[in-house]
Every structure is written in C-alpha cells, then in structure tokens.
Amino acid sequence: LYCLIIDELSKVWSSPNCPKSILDRIKRCHHHYEPKCDHMTKFNTVHVHGQGTWEFRLWGNTKSPSEVKFCIDNSIDTFRSAYNRYYARDNSMFDRIAKLYPNEKLEYTFPSIARDAMVQGKSIETILADIENSRLASTTRESVG
C-alpha cells in the first residue's frame, strides 16, 4: 500500500477534524510514501473496506496516538461524486483512468495516480495528461515504424 499524500482531496474533504497543521505535516512527508510515512507522523494509507469505504488515518508520534480519520462511506460512487463536485466534471477523470487501465480497479489505480501527483508536485490532471501523451507517442511510433 502507498502512503497516499492528500492535497487536492484534502480540499474536497476540508473536515473540521483535520486541522491545517496536520495537512501541512501530511504534505511535508511526501518523500516517504511507501509503505508508511515516518516524517514526524505515520500516515497509513487508503483502506478499501468491504463496502468500498475510503479511509485515511494520521497518527502522531505518541504512545497514545491521536487519530484523525475521515471516511467517505458506502461505495466508490460516493467517493466519485464528491470528487466530481469539486472538479464539476461528471465522471471524466475516472473515465480517463478507466480507459488508461481497463483491466485494473479504480480503487487501486486512482490512489496510485494521486500519489504520483503528490510525489512529483503535479496535479492529477497533469499526471493523466502525461500518461495519455506518452501512450499516444508510443502508438504513433509503432504505426510509423
């Protein structure tokens, strides 16, 4: 599992349970992203429960760790609609991911892309465009060759 660093998603779920100082600490530990984040904090990644709940937890470095948890309940559809409300784009982002990785579940591909975006300091949109462009370039090379 990845240590998934939330930036864009934290804007979607700007929860009162998640103080800004914690978000700052999450962002600061992006270079220790796998399998856990030990830079001031331990940030445990996405747990996809039986019903498709996405859960993010942050532990402080204490004997009785405080836990910050924000869940999007029930299903990937709930997660999808929250994300789309933020981007105001139907399901286009998820459709693009599904086209790029037709044989893989969104539960796995999306966190991986989000992690890459954080590590590289790019938006998810930019990461998707990079993947699409590189695939287009390799397809063009094959047809020419």
Give residue ranges: language-model regions.
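C-terminal accessory/tail domains of diverse enzymes
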Residues: 1-145
